[in-house]
């Protein structure tokens, strides 16, 4: 069972996370385990926790901010630096309010909302039905929820669903109506329509309004793409499932401009390219699936979601859409500015480009990669159970790449370990830990996904053995691998290259 939170009628418990999944006795990955790990190890905290928490808002801690930035950096590398046809942009969060009129957000960007008339709790009608049907499959409405009319949603809810908040069996609900998801405010001291402004609900519109600037300043030729990572804001009716659905989130989007008639083939190419990204960074193919939209958005010709198998089931982590020429045509119409492209390679033909969009949620990627990496692994011997919690994160995503551990704090081992850490800092994100046994320190690093641990011991610093003979391991350290727990002696002088090579040749764990 996943608890739902209503900001108005359900105060946040002072010392609790909001959305804890039901605990299980086995060693599988559950949402409550991920939430617990995130807080305990500094990945994610509840925002404003000392004041009871802010609904749908989360802070990314010391490890979380590096993990999230690594995902973003790898996405950027994969989408722009490995390609010759994609450039970057960082557009403003605040855009002219007519931008959102042209895009259709003012008229169409809404979710179906329904209220319980007894406790006044509000719900997204479509999600209320989906959650109910997932636990009561025999009540399937017989058609996809996203194709149901408001009247059909209302009838199904009245006939089947007791209020999740107050538990009332009377099923007294309001009519289903649309709730616009944009946050709006006013810029400056005057609160009138001429100063109306919105927090952007998606990053892509800044790309469309800058289309002509990018073409002219960078001499871009179609086909080409523009990538962007940034924050977006949606006034969600319901927040649930930890960081999966929140009001403030980050998107990693790319808009690919192409000649009309070539869009279908390019659409399929981007579907394959984006699918391969998740496989490359460690998501098992069995945990991914495509979802084809039965009901398309007002701007779309075709749309697929990449869904990941979270502990809560398959949910979207990225959408790939054929937006046709809708956005550029709408901005031409609303602004009066010509957004056509002059194709010099096609006899100076003028046309409005079609757009293929890839839109990934950075926060949802964060959660998906965590869930995929999480394992409670039995490493016991002689028939005894001994479980370690380990995150099998790809080394390029892990918040810490290398931990340096002195065997003891004394006899110059700590100083040598710090010297080695300093040497590695230029190349890798490092950690230093000298508290507790080496075994316990390994476990701490496993739990946060550190792929490599270096142990500095007496063999490292002693040129000779106790009998006076040469020590062949002088100037070496023990390098321990997270996934296999195997250990290898490596020369200090070769550490940088050895670790770089290990990262370059890393193979995701298959489970």
Predicted regions and their residues:
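NTP/phosphate- and nucleic-acid-binding module
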Residues: 13-511
